[in-house]
């Protein structure tokens, strides 16, 4: 086996020292930035773009599910249904007619 060159160990230690110094400086800059601008951060990716794309695809999927559920309900029920956003995750909601209360009974 070939032995490493005599200066290789020194170069490696020098690299490690430089990288440690750069990391320390980076942490200091990030800390100063967050102190000067609370709530500000450096985005490392573009999650908003991906989230918007996912939300749009999810909306289309839900719309297709709502349409299918509505068609199924109208075909298999005598009631009337509408598509409506629901707090409980229902895709469609039944529409119930309002009936006038019966007149008071005379005695």
Curated annotation (Swiss-Prot):
**Top-level taxon:** Eukaryota
Where is it located? Nucleus
Gene Ontology cellular component annotations, sorted alphabetically: nucleoplasm; nucleus; SOSS complex
Keywords linked to the UniProt accession: DNA damage, DNA repair, Nucleus
Q: Cross-referenced Pfam families, in alphabetical order?
A: SOSSC (PF15925)
Which GO annotations describe the biological process of this protein? DNA damage response; DNA repair; response to ionizing radiation
Q: Which InterPro entries match?
A: SOSSC
Disulfide bonding pattern of the chain: none
- The residue ranges crossing the membrane are none
Subunit structure, as described in the record = Belongs to the multiprotein complex Integrator. Component of the SOSS complex, composed of soss-b (soss-b1/nabp2 or soss-b2/nabp1), soss-a/ints3 and soss-c/inip.
Q: What does this protein do?
A: Component of the SOSS complex, a multiprotein complex that functions downstream of the MRN complex to promote DNA repair and G2/M checkpoint. The SOSS complex associates with single-stranded DNA at DNA lesions and influences diverse endpoints in the cellular DNA damage response including cell-cycle checkpoint activation, recombinational repair and maintenance of genomic stability. Required for efficient homologous recombination-dependent repair of double-strand breaks (DSBs).
Per the record, the similarity remark reads:
Belongs to the SOSS-C family.
Name of this protein: SOSS complex subunit C
């Amino acid at each position: 086996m070939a032995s490493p060159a005599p200066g290789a160990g020194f170069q490696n230690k020098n690299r490690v020292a430089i990288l440690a110094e750069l990391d320390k400086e980076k942490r200091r800059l990030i800390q100063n930035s967050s102190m000067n601008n609370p709530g500000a951060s450096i985005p490392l990716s573009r999650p908003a773009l991906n989230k918007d794309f996912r939300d749009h695809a999810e909306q289309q999927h839900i719309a297709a599910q709502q349409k299918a559920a509505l068609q199924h309900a109208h075909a298999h029920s005598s009631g009337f249904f509408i598509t409506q956003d629901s707090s409980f995750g229902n895709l469609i909601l039944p529409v119930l007619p309002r009936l006038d209360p019966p007149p008071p009974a005379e005695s």
